[in-house]
Amino acid sequence: MNSLNIFLKNLDHNFYTIKSKLKNSTKLIGVVKANAYGSDSLIIAKRLESLGIDMIAVAYTSEGIYLKKNKINIPILVFYPQLESLKELYKYRLEPAIYSKLIFKKFNELIEEKSYKKYPIHIKYNTGLNRIGFSSNETTWIVKSLNKSSLALKSVYSHLSMSEEKKPSKISEKQINVFKNIIENY
């Protein structure tokens, strides 16, 4: 039988090490998608919440609902909300990453139908990983649409294709520059 030992004190150490390198105003998100990469999302989320993490992130709405039902009270970002899960996402007050015009429009329609004002969302850009996300040339549409919507922008983010490298690669540098140009429009 295989087993996995999780040393929560090591998680504590890593959290405080990362936090010490950030400005006090910088928000920190703990990613616990895919059952915290196989190490039990509820245990990890509870520990991160007790340490003072600002937000938890999951891949899908069902993962966020599981955490909410198990008393995780900090905001939960859902990276890949699907059209069929938007009502549940709203019901549990999960925060969606909006990565397409269709998701933006459908979620805004739902929020307006509920008469909710300024529901927090996150905008995901594709700066080179080429999975999902808005392209940089859609920024004007996003900004105009946000200004007319019942949605409130909480963050803008992307995903570096080579983020595990110690020194940014040429590809990562290009993605960072694209992202910086996007941010100037907000």
PLM features per residue range, with description:
Residues F15:
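Histidine/acidic residue-rich metal-binding segments in metalloenzymes
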Residues N2-I6, N10, T26-Y186:
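Active-site-proximal beta-alpha core segment in soluble small-molecule metabolic enzymes
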